[in-house]
């Protein structure tokens, strides 16, 4: 995880003139990055909202959002509160399995970002409870694990609306990974304006797809 200054430095090293920070369900890092850029790099305010269609998790990117939008901040606060509550529920279930983890250890790892199961897994790794993050998911907190707790998510259409209402442009994140081709026409009707094509795991063939 980079600090805002380190992130801007990496962008400069790559000889890029523009960047966007799109943390999951969180905009706390946007202003510090803009300040760190100091006008040397254009920073597009962004966010990545977690949403669902039935049981399928869908990630919606929002670019050019107004980070001062009260409606957006209210929605993100609601999501953050649910994520925090979820962590406590997970820790209670882990305790029932004689796995003891302090909530503050998890929140310290999450920092100012939105807390998630990944941070629980990293805290378990730090305490030597598991040998790697994957083990934490497979043995304890994954969807089939004994300490699994479902997440609160927006509907995909509502995620698009939240982005648009905040003055942003809604873009479907890594669509090939999400295998949701048949849902895209409905997303477009709801206001979707783009698809993420350049993603670290995508080959040229996938990008063309």
Locations of regions flagged by a protein language model:
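An N-terminally biased module of ancient metal coordination in phosphate/nucleic-acid-related enzymes
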Residues: 1-56, 140-142, 146, 161-164, ...
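Active-site gating loops and adjacent loop-to-helix segments of metal-dependent hydrolytic enzymes
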Residues: 52-84, 101-103, 122, 126-145
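Conserved phosphoryl-transfer catalytic core
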Residues: 81-108
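Short, glycine/charge-rich beta-strand/loop segments that flank catalytic centers
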Residues: 46-49, 104-110
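Alpha-helix N-cap and loop-to-helix initiation/capping positions
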Residues: 78-82, 151, 202
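Conserved acidic, metal-coordinating active-site core of Asp-based
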Residues: 110-171
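Short, glycine- and charge-enriched coil/turn segments that flank and shape catalytic ligand pockets
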Residues: 39, 100, 108-113, 185
């Amino acid at each position: 995880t980079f600090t805002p200054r380190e992130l801007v430095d990496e962008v400069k090293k790559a000889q890029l003139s523009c960047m966007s920070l799109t943390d999951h369900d969180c905009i706390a890092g946007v202003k510090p990055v803009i300040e760190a850029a100091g006008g040397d790099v254009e920073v597009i305010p962004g966010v990545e909202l977690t949403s669902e269609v039935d049981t399928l998790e869908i990630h919606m990117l929002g670019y050019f959002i107004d980070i001062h939008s009260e409606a957006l901040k209210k929605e993100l606060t609601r999501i953050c509160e649910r994520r925090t509550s979820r962590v406590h529920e997970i820790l209670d279930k882990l305790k029932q399995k004689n796995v003891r983890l302090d909530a503050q250890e998890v929140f310290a790892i999450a920092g100012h970002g939105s807390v998630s199961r990944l941070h629980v897994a990293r805290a378990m790794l730090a305490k030597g409870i598991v040998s790697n993050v994957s083990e934490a998911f497979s043995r304890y907190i994954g969807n089939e694990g004994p300490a699994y707790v479902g997440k609160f998510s927006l509907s995909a259409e509502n995620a698009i609306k939240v982005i648009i209402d905040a003055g942003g442009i809604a873009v479907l994140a890594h669509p090939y990974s999400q295998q949701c081709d048949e849902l895209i026409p409905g997303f477009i009707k709801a206001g979707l304006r783009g698809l993420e094509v350049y993603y670290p795991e995508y080959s040229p063939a996938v990008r063309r797809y």
